[in-house]
């Protein structure tokens, strides 16, 4: 793609588009049209998602109202109780939460959430933002279904500056009130394909949705551009031995919902998928290129050699990446995620500062070209050299990441 085309894609998607929203659908249709313009067959695959509209959310701490946003899908009601801040969720601090509203660092995660409920917590306050940022933004969070696991509790999110004030003031009581309307909505994956000469496929994935505060240029329209660059480069050599399927995943930021929906709906077809190549955040001018491999260890060495022969530096390692490669690996498909991480101070995600200004069009194209070269090598292989098996260590990491074990 030309640099002008890359910049135009960033401009055309320069707005917040959260999972399940009308704005997400607008971006999905745009990506579909981009794929079709490159000569690929493309379509949308919808899937259901839990949605909620917050009608009212209030947090009163020691008689003073604190700006907040209610957690979507946490239920409706009011709770008033003593307030406690806990810096960890271990057996020591959990003794202090019974009958109390709990202020915590970080988000509500499955085991920590249920540990606090079992210890008697009656409500939750989380926070985000940064003490050093000039804004007082508050992210719109949700109580994810796989976190709640059927047990809803009122929760609100506040800004980091107010969280610090609450702790410094040694606040004693809190009152949370949330009123919401919950309903089932629809997100969708955008799927495009370039058939090969065999009945086996390589699936490339990248999510296109954003969090509520972010326009998502870096996280992750950059990854979508990486897929489009790969599509653009490989279409001229088609058909390759392996077919190429491009999946632009919806609702990744809500818990990998798009890739989970895709792998569940195509479970039988995944037997013919030899590799998943996921792209999540590339194109920043500073920072190292990484490859997280959820497959056999020898693939790490192969990627290093492949990159080194092209003068390309890469930090390759095995593990489970917090992105759309994970559901593929969990379904037995060898998977890897490519990314270019920013050094500290060079960019932030999941906030208002994730804009196209973070990105270099030239670096986006260079990163995309490397991913395309790697994919082309694999697509033209007589036999995909990666064993179609997931090592036990990766399986264990998947169980932990997906909340099946601690």
Predicted features along the sequence, with ranges:
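N-terminal capping segment at the start of a domain
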Residues: 1-23, 38, 132-137, 142-144, ...
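Acidic, glycine-rich active-site loops and adjacent beta-strand->loop/helix elements
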Residues: 107-108, 130-131, 182, 208-210, ...
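Noncatalytic luminal/extracellular "stalk/propeptide" segments of secretory-pathway proteins
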Residues: 3-98
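Metal-dependent peptidase/peptidase-like ectodomains
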Residues: 199, 239, 249-348
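Soluble metallo-hydrolase cores and metallopeptidase-like ectodomains found primarily
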Residues: 62-91, 139-217, 229-237, 241-243
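His/Asp/Glu-rich mid-to-C-terminal helical/loop segments that flank catalytic regions of hydrolases
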Residues: 232, 345-406
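Second-shell loop/turn segments in exported
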Residues: 14-22, 70, 103-106, 151-153, ...
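Structural recognition of the beta-strand scaffold that forms the well-ordered cores
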Residues: 101-103, 123-126, 155-157, 191, ...
